[in-house]
Amino acid sequence: MHLKAAKEVIISGGAINSPQLLQLSGIGPASLLQQLGIDVQHDLPGVGENLRDHYATRLTASVEGVQTINDKAHGIKLIGEVAKYCIGQQSILKLGPTTVFCFWRSKPSLTNPDVQINFTPGTHQRGMQSTLEKKSGFTLATWQHRPESSGYVRAVTNNPFDKPEIQPNYLSDEEDQRVILDATKLCRKLMQTDALKPFQVKETYPGTAIQNDNELLHSIRDIGQSIYHLMGTCRMGPINDPMAVVDDQLKVHGIDNLRVIDASIMPTMISANLNAGVLMIAEKGADLVLGKSPLTMSGLQGQIT
C-alpha cells in the first residue's frame, strides 16, 4: 500500500518521535542514516540534535508539630480525606503536586529569573513517586530555566517500532552546574529561615553531611530527574544555519510539503513549563497551514470581547 499526501504532511510527534520519524524517512545526518541502512533523501545534520530539557533535583526535610500530606495519605486519615473530597470539603485530594512557586535569579546581573523552586508539603519514597513517606515532611524541587546543556535523539535501527537512543547530557555544561548548585544552596537557606524554625526542620536528603560542591553535585546527579519538558530536536532557523531543521513557516529545509509542528521546533528553552508555548506553536502552525495572514493590532482588538 502506498499513501500520498494531496497537499502536505505535518509531523507532530514531539521532541522524541518527530526526529526519529524524519531519520527513518531518510531525512537527517547522512552518516547516521547510512550506518542504519536508510536511503538518504536529504542530509540534514540538525535532525535529532539540540535536545534540551528541564532537569530537576530535590531536597527533602522532616518536620515536627505540623501535619503534611504524608500524615493524611495513609490508613483511616486517607479515608477521611476521600470522604471530605466527595462532599466538597477541603481535602488533600484537591491539592496539586506543588503549592508554592519561587522564581530566582542566580546572578544579580540577570534580567529574568533563571531558577524555579517548587514547594510540596510532602515527601515520597526514593524511586517511588506514587508512594508517600509516613513521617511528616516537605520537598523543595529546583531546576534551571534556560540550560545550555544539550543532547540528541537518534534512531538505532531502521525499524520504526524500535525506541531511539535518547541522550540528554544533563549538566554537561559548567554554567548549568553552577546554577543548579546555587539553587540547591538557596533551598537549604530557605529550610533554615526563622518562619520554619518552630517546625524543627531536618534535612533528610541529600543530608547535612553533604557540604562541598563535588559531593553536592554528585547527589544532584543521583536524585535528579526530567521534568518532561523535552524540546529542540527539529530546531527552527534560517537555511544557512547548518543545524536548523525547519524555517519560519515550520517547513523542513530542502523538502517540499513537509512541516513539523510541535515542541521540537523550539531553538532554545523557554523560562517556563512548555505547555503554553506548545499551544502557541500549534495555533501559529494551524494559521500557517491555512494560509492566514498574521493578525494586526487593530485586527486583534476586534477579536477581544
Where are these regions (language model features)?
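Glycine-rich loop(s) and the adjacent beta-strand/alpha-helix scaffold that form part
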Residues: 1-82, 91-92, 296
